[in-house]
Amino acid sequence: MKPVSELFNNRTGSSNTLWSVTPDDTVFEAIKVLAERGVGALIVMEKGKLVGIVSERDYTRKIALQGKNSKESLVRDIMTANVLVVNPRTRTRECMAIMSEKNIRHLPVVDGDTVVGMLSIRDLMNDIIRDHEFTISQLESYIKG
């Protein structure tokens, strides 16, 4: 399978944009960004450093289901601080294994100390579908001669 960097090279438009919040933003502000941008998770940055990740799942479990107020709660209260990351050279198969084993849907992609992207389970599934469609097309061409 291909490296993560190849997946990112095939992205277009806003799917290449990296969305972030700070630990001191309210959960409401984070949820608003998630909804406006149509993404499932945001990186949490503080002083230029990756300090966490916050997802729709975090909001649901730690705010909505506990009856807390998203306008009064901070991102730092619900974010995952011990973030699993991959680098641009990590193979997509390994990313899929990490996501499956850890039951997560997003992985920040870090090159050195710089966050260069966010990989989602959707990215991986779309890539698998494209690969399968290509294989089918090649097989059909071979069969037809």
What are these regions (language model features)?
Residues 1-145:
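Tandem CBS (Cystathionine beta-synthase) repeat/Bateman regulatory domains
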